[in-house]
């Protein structure tokens, strides 16, 4: 499975959404790099990005197994933090459950909590800002993908979407994508009622996120006693593009809490 490593220090495993690739998380790399000594390990999940060639993928658990191999090979017995976006947030929760003694902190951006689309609590997509003349100028195929989840429909927002989100769709392995979606079972998901992860945790959700919403994240907060939970107005499923300053601030605080935790318990 493809990995891209940036920086040095404590490992920070970064897991993207479905069906994207690691580039969707690169807008956050600046704040990761400014918030301490972090070795950012970005992955491309099976069937996506530069891991599109992988075979033998059957369901969410197969994806999880591939990431666990990366943890074993790249991180070993060291402690590390995890940050997951969308589907990556669900994987991050499962990996935290599996590696709870080694995980220093869990961060999630617009996390998928419930795999079944029809069972999610999500708002209707209502754009907050729309530049109609700009949308009309887009290629119909680009406009169709963009407007499925966008709520800040401007040239500036689309340029970020076009740079960090859209390119992933051209490298998908449809067979693998379909295989992943065929079986959504994951260890530790949903979290057992008795399960608690006591280390610094972060939920960043979008008030206008019509893909995974924000209510389902709130409903599992009791499993994470040291979680900060943020619901951002003017943010959809690409909250880090829609409200970048707020998202950066929240991530910086989360990483500071992890650093303080390491010092207190070292």
What are these regions (language model features)?
Residues 119, 137-195:
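Conserved alpha/beta-hydrolase catalytic His-Asp/Glu region
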Residues 197, 203-205, 209:
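Short beta-strand/loop motif that positions the catalytic acidic residue
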Residues 210-216:
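Conserved alpha/beta-hydrolase "acid-adjacent" motif
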Residues 84-88, 92:
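Gly/Ala-rich beta-loop-alpha elbow adjacent to hydrolase catalytic centers
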Residues 5-52:
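Conserved HGGG/HGGXW glycine-rich cap/lid loop of the alpha/beta-hydrolase fold
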Residues 93, 97, 105-136:
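Flexible "cap/lid" loop of the alpha/beta hydrolase fold
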Residues 235-248:
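Catalytic histidine-centered segment of alpha/beta-hydrolase-like enzymes
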Residues 36-83, 249:
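Active-site loop/oxyanion-hole signature of alpha/beta-hydrolase fold enzymes
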